[in-house]
């Protein structure tokens, strides 16, 4: 297990929900099996040569040594980080999701992982998209600063790179709490709401930052299922490759067990959940200015949806892009029908692209920083802007 988990981890499949094609890992299956067989033979030879009592004694010493290391590690972590304490976290709810200002609205509509090149391939098959994006300007030279949301979104909101001068979590919290962009909006009288379920913050960190925050506690509603998934995570690293297909699962499912809503309904970033809300919920009107950051799943793995936002078994990256546009068009139409479209600044963008040639798609694991992830989409519409779709 030690050798497998420390020296044979270069080409591990992703745990982000990507549908893994295990046939691409045959060489890893063979290498892993050979190593395990060799180690088993060596252990058997040692058992015969050194005799049972000596092997038993050696294994006992090694086991006690490893146990002491684990106990000391857990002790230090429990003292310094209160790991056994049920902590409260700030999460974002659906509160005021469709509350719009009769004065001015500023909306950032973020579709995760939509690559510009692949987006245009889908666009060309759907002429209705151009009519839906009337009044917008598309910027075809946008580049993402980072390849993943965790780093990319704080950069988008602040223009500030993470330079490792502080712990990343402190940088992230500072950006979400008081980036110059957010501070400017507050000075202009905007009420800020953030609709996202990818982030959680420790209690107190985000107090007063957004209008739709609630506190949730850890709630392991199915301990046996949770423990099974944790064991599977360990198996993905330390088990031989022949067992890894049985250990794979989407780690985002842990999040669904970790948090339980305290009072209000938590926001869900899934395209189908938001699409349902768009169809069923009514827009309400207020006088003050409103800012909304809406972060949806977009074309992020795992792929669930067809272009009509139905859950299907054979969904892929392109159908997920289609579902993203269906949700986007429905939202824009809702704003138009409610009369709050013209008085809204609307930015539709992705935080990064997607490496369509990457892991579990056509070839085995590539460098995670493939340039395909650096080309997002960016559409911008200003107040009372009226013209055909423009490309800049």
Whereabouts are the PLM-identified features?
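Catalytic domains that recognize anionic headgroups
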Residues: 1-35, 43-392
